[in-house]
Amino acid sequence: MNESWLEGLPDNIVENLESLNNYVVQRICERIRKIGDIGAADAHRLKTAIEYAGADLKAIEKEVARIMGVNQQEVERLFDEVAKENVEFSNTYYRARKMDALQSYTARLALSSFVDAAKRQAMDGTANISNTYMIGFRRGKQTIPLREYYISAIDRAITYVQTGVVDYQSAMRSTVKEMARSGLRRVTWESGYSRRLDSSARMNILEGVRRLNSQMMEETGREFGADGVEISAHGLCAPDHRHIQGRQFSNEEWERINHSLDRPLGTLNCQHFATPIVLGVSKSVYSQKELADINRRSSEKIEYKGQKMSRYEASQRQRQMETAIRYAKDERDAMIATGDKLGATQARKKSAALSAEYKRFCEQAGLTPRPERTRSMTGPTVQRV
């Protein structure tokens, strides 16, 4: 399976969640702007935060339901596609063994159960959010449910207008920044830990895909008589997996090695997968020289602003910079939605400076820029500026 193909699988789902995030943030920001437009002289026209919440949260719940419906279909399609790729791969070995080829993963109960389980797990947080109590924004170390957060923010806006605060936009700026920087998160009552919906979706789906690959390959490999595995290899590999990538192992040896790893294959953002093989028959994908070149590139040191790091570490820095740029653009869009020209200008300058730094860093580190990972998706309620 092609690594870039695998990496792109969650894109549609992540984009849908990014769109939902921007819709919610900008819906609240538009309400903040409209309240500020009323002014102290007409403060008697203001409703309560709970009254505003009726219309706004109803619209948000409708958008949540729409996005969840689209994502549910996308999860179904995505894992069916992955399963189909696995079946086609396995059929190469079935035919070589003079065995009947699989027509579909549904022809095997075990394979069907793997796919169904992967779909159910992927739905969690990407396609099964049923109401606004399940999502919210981070404030300090807590994730506050959306309704509670909305009422708190709008109450603050109403109070500022009623008291005639001199600079309404400046007074509300910290709230807007907090929302934009947090992004929509799944409310976790137990641990208090949370991740943005879009970020966690990408990681969870990719881990689900790799787990499904592993399960299906192990099952079909057992059927066609595989007695070993070959580990995939890629550039910019983490140090803890560099010694195993691209190599072949017997099933027994691989089980022992994988269990000894602090980060087992395919988990915690690992991009590797194990392909079933017949030892002594299946030729290695990479020669020793090719594998040495790949590993050398991963460990090769670069220097940026006096700091030395491996090329792999540089790739992790690249991801962090992309996230920072995207969040700065989210902040810019939120400020535009509230009508805060100064706040929007500050956020725009910040994103421009981060983008320039990102370009310089990629050039010096020899990394390919990924502009698609730095974009902001403006929600449908606000025209892009």
Ranges and model annotations:
Residues 268:
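Residues that flank catalytic or metal-binding motifs in active/ligand-binding sites
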